[in-house]
């Protein structure tokens, strides 16, 4: 995959529950703590190294931000780092929260 793909929250939900992709959330720490998708890895400059160590480059990665804009740049960056399959989640956490309000975790872990 030379270019990331955009997927909607329903596709992201399916991939997450089928465990065919991991989800990273690139929002700021306060926003992440106030609500995030259960199982999402909080990807920051400080956690990038750990994420890359803990995941094989053939792991499919879905990137989520606030509304689906910033995730595109992060998705392209992860491709450039060597990940084979990267997706940007259209609508971001805002869309996730609207579609799956019962599936929102709180806290920093």
From Swiss-Prot:
Pfam families: Rhodanese (PF00581). Keywords: Cytoplasm, Transferase. SUPFAM superfamilies: Rhodanese/Cell cycle control phosphatase. The active site is at residue 65. GO terms for molecular function: thiosulfate-cyanide sulfurtransferase activity. GO terms for cellular component: cytoplasm. Belongs to the GlpE family. This is Thiosulfate sulfurtransferase GlpE. It comes from Klebsiella pneumoniae subsp. pneumoniae (strain ATCC 700721 / MGH 78578).
């Amino acid at each position: 995959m030379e270019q990331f793909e955009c997927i909607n929250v329903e596709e992201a939900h399916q991939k997450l529950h089928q465990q065919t992709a991991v989800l990273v959330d690139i929002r700021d720490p306060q926003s992440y703590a106030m609500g995030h998708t259960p199982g999402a890895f909080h990807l920051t400059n400080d956690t990038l190294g750990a994420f890359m160590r803990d995941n094989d480059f053939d792991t499919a990665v879905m990137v989520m931000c606030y509304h689906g804009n910033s995730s595109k740049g992060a998705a392209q960056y992860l491709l450039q780092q060597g990940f084979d399959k990267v997706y940007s989640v259209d609508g971001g956490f805002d869309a996730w929260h609207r579609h799956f309000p019962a599936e929102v975790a709180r806290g920093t872990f």
